[in-house]
Amino acid sequence: MAKSGNFDVILFDVGGVMLTNGWDHIERAVVLKQFDLDRAEFEARHEKPYDAWERDTISVYDYLDAAIFYQPRSFTPDDFIAAMKEQSVPIPANAMSVLKDVAASDKYLVGLLNNESRLLHEYRMEKYGLKPYLDVQLSSCYLGMRKPDAEIYRRAIDILGVPANRIIFIDDRKGNADAATAQGMHAIQFTGEDQLRAQLKELEIL
């Protein structure tokens, strides 16, 4: 890998940048309706185990036991997991082609910095063939930390071993981008492929 310009590392988010979110409120609403579950009741039970699941301190089955299978159901956890996976699809004007172009340049270390459970993260990487384009996957399920907490950005910087100002971070959520900026990274808030390409061209990445 030959270094180029002012940056050494390009980090992408996944949900909202390349694919739909793995298990956010929109995806949850679809699956809850499919299984005829009360959304308010689910959401009241969901948040605490969800945080632990994304940090990989509990399994998907532990999460579902806490949020759904605390009483008998007419469907199985595996039925529910299959429906969860079906929600992961590419978004319009996504950044997958940008990821591939940056990786093909062989000038940068290319990776992810995302919040996702191990189950959905690894499914999404395999399903959409993203792994060959990545040098590093800094997912919440591997680091035990979540965006926008400052500690996940600091840990990412330590792992990457380069100054924060030589890292570009791309995320669709302003709060996550702002948190990266606060740790010294160059953050880009993603709104679409054309916008991202234009900004990376200005930075002489593409």
Specify the residue positions occupied by each region the protein language model found.
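Asp-based, Mg2+/Mn2+-dependent phosphohydrolase catalytic module
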Residues: 1-7, 117-206
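Active-site neighborhood of HAD-like aspartate-dependent phosphohydrolases
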Residues: 2-45
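Short, acidic loop-to-helix structural element flanking the phosphoryl-transfer center
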Residues: 5, 78-110, 122, 150, ...
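Generic structural signal for small/hydrophobic residues in well-ordered secondary structure
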Residues: 13-16, 56, 102, 112, ...
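Alpha-helical elements of Rossmann-like donor-binding domains used by nucleotide-donor carbohydrate transfer enzymes
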Residues: 26-30, 48, 62, 66, ...
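Short, surface-exposed acidic
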Residues: 35-46, 72-82, 205-206
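Metal-dependent phosphoesterase signature
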Residues: 50-96
